Amino acid sequence: MISLNQVTKQYGQVTVLKNITLSIEEPGIYCLLGRNGAGKTTFLKSIAGYQNITTGTIQVDGKTISTAALDTGVSYIENFAKHFNLPVRKLLQIASEVNPSYDYDFASEMMERFELDGKKKFNHLSLGMKTMVSTIICLASNKNVILLDEPVLGFDAIMRVEFYEMLAESFQKHPRIIIVSTHIISGRCSAKHHKNRKNETEPVAGKQAFYNSENGCHFFAPP
């Protein structure tokens, strides 16, 4: 469960998130939609505990989130994620060693499906392949909350379809809260499930959504 209560985030005089109250109680794949600079990354980093908020509170599974928390129960990956210049297979191995719940079999299966060369160093991969490896590591973490920031960046149309299929398979295997941010509108993020109301929450498809009027950042519950 994720709970945000009157969350505001400011950088100096600039307000990026303003008075957001939101509760996500059920497992599902959720979409965070907004143009570049709308505050999507700030929203996800705040939930993950990667940065402190200005005012308000954020809780995940009843635990208050802050940058001081050692284990938030959240796995977050952003676009342009930077890893050590190590072979891809070594990155998967390290991830499994530091996380007892890590699903190494799932990660290996996805590596094979997307024909990723485990011997190739991460920094030598294309943007799309870097994003795919980062996403696989994130999903295989088996955390209760998965946050994916622009995961389809650098993907062509076919790869986007394959990505969402992988996401659905991961969710079926381990139901949890998965939030995917994007600026690309697709069938997975349909605007018909949301109505705009400035800085308020409202029921959408049995759940809730918000519209951040500061920058135009939309949150969609599953259909």
Where are these regions (language model features)?
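Conserved ABC transporter NBD signature motif
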Residues: 56-69
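Catalytic Walker B motif of ABC-type/P-loop ATPase nucleotide-binding domains
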Residues: 146-150, 155
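Helical segment within the ABC ATPase nucleotide-binding domain
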Residues: 161-173
